[in-house]
């Protein structure tokens, strides 16, 4: 199996129907990201098995990267936990195990063994799914090992899981790996994951196999280049908007965030905002509806079951700050214990940028427009 992404053709029909429309949407106007695909390819060629994880803030393009990858590699297994109704472990196991059976074990038709496996899958309890997934992975690993003894090209089993952080943790025991992902992997078996920033001690994964993490935040120059390519490609049918200065200003306003960028470009394309002000971080007086809905989902996740007084105090400080603040600085401003502040920041880590400034880790919201949107919520007024 070729490990590098192909520009064409694009296939989505080999994946479950509930993911096909999403894959088509995420690969539309796709541009760049070669540095990510190169890293994936290098990992696959350097290791006989393993986990490769793409980490990035909301909207930075993780889902599109994975969608492009699996669309160009239809033998991959694909799952997206962010799709409505697909964030529980039992849903994941049912979908992935079915794909494994259909794509790798049922090549010769519905044999009695395949019928037996599908019957077992239908009658599995969610907590039994872990061993069944491991069983299928081992069977396929053995099959690939035998096949590659005579084949010139070494085929790999690649399972791609998007939005790992969207899992409903209540759907499985807290001591288990997210989605019951296996601790050990057989030869030629790989998982490619995408997730938002997380604390290492709360990764939800205990694995003893080769692994690598690529954090998109560590590649600002490459991200900027891809953003510019995306803008130019999107606006190629609107010559009056493709001037270099406009593209550069739009790229700067996007802060390399593709969700923000795609929504703004859509609004520009629909000419619904002729008064775009590139001097402002939000570009328009009002956010496009799609972006506002995206931020609303962030807000619901941040609020959880409710905000404490400390939560609100930290939130107000972060909303008012246009630069990063350290834990000690926040502590001095709101007169609260640093430990309590750290707990709040840890809970919101997926929506924050953390960077070292003057020897201290400073925190800010991942995008200026999200910070501004939060500042307009009634709870902060």
Residue ranges and their predicted role:
Residues 3-60, 64-69, 149-150, 170-171, ...:
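Walker A/P-loop-proximal flanking segment of P-loop NTPase domains
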Residues 8, 200, 243-289, 312-313, ...:
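Amphipathic alpha-helical "lid/sensor" segments that cap RecA-like P-loop NTPase cores
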Residues 25-27, 34, 280-333, 359, ...:
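Winged-helix-like regulatory helical subdomains adjacent to P-loop NTPase cores
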Residues 50-81, 98, 195-207:
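P-loop NTPase Walker A phosphate-binding motif
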Residues 60, 65-68, 297, 311, ...:
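C-terminal leucine-rich, beta-strand-based interaction scaffolds used for sensing/assembly
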Residues 112-161, 184, 242, 246-253, ...:
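Mid-core helix/loop region of P-loop NTP-binding domains shared across ATPases and GTPases
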Residues 145, 152, 156-194, 339-343:
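Conserved Walker B catalytic segment
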Residues 216-245, 288-299, 377:
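Conserved small helical "lid"/interfacial subdomain of P-loop NTPases
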């Amino acid at each position: 199996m070729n490990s590098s992404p192909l520009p064409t053709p694009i296939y989505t029909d080999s994946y479950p129907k509930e993911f096909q429309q999403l894959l088509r949407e995420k690969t539309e106007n796709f541009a760049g990201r070669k540095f990510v695909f190169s890293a994936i390819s290098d990992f696959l060629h350097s290791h006989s098995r393993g986990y490769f994880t793409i980490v990035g803030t909301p909207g930075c393009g993780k889902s599109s990267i994975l969608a492009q990858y699996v669309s160009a590699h239809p033998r991959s297994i694909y799952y997206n936990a962010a799709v409505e109704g697909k964030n529980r472990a039992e849903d994941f196991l049912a979908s992935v195990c079915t794909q494994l059976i259909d794509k790798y074990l049922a090549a010769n038709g519905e044999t009695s063994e395949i019928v037996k496996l599908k019957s077992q899958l239908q009658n599995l309890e969610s907590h039994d799914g872990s061993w069944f997934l491991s069983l299928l992975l081992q069977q396929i690993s053995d099959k690939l090992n035998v096949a590659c003894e005579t084949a010139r090209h070494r085929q790999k089993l690649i399972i791609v899981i998007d939005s790992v952080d969207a899992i409903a943790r209540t759907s499985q025991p807290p001591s288990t790996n997210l989605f019951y992902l296996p601790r050990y992997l057989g030869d030629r078996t790989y998982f490619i994951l995408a997730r938002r920033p997380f604390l290492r001690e709360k990764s939800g994964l205990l694995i003893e196999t080769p692994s690598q993490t690529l954090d998109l935040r560590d590649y600002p120059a490459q991200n900027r280049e891809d953003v510019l390519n995306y803008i130019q490609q999107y606006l190629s049918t609107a010559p009056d908007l493709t001037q270099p200065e406009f593209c550069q200003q739009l790229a700067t306003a996007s802060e390399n965030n593709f969700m923000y960028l795609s929504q703004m470009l859509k609004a520009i394309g629909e000419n619904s905002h002729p008064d775009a002000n590139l001097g402002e971080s939000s570009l328009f007086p009002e956010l496009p509806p799609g972006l506002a809905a995206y931020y609303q989902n962030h807000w619901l996740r941040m609020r959880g079951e409710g905000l404490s007084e400390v939560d609100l105090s930290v939130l107000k400080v972060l909303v008012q700050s246009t630069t990063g603040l350290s834990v000690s600085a926040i502590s001095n401003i709101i007169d609260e214990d640093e430990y309590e502040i750290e707990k709040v920041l840890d809970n919101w880590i997926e929506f924050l940028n953390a960077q070292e400034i003057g020897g201290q880790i400073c925190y800010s919201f991942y995008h200026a427009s999200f910070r501004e949107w939060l500042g307009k919520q009634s709870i902060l007024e």
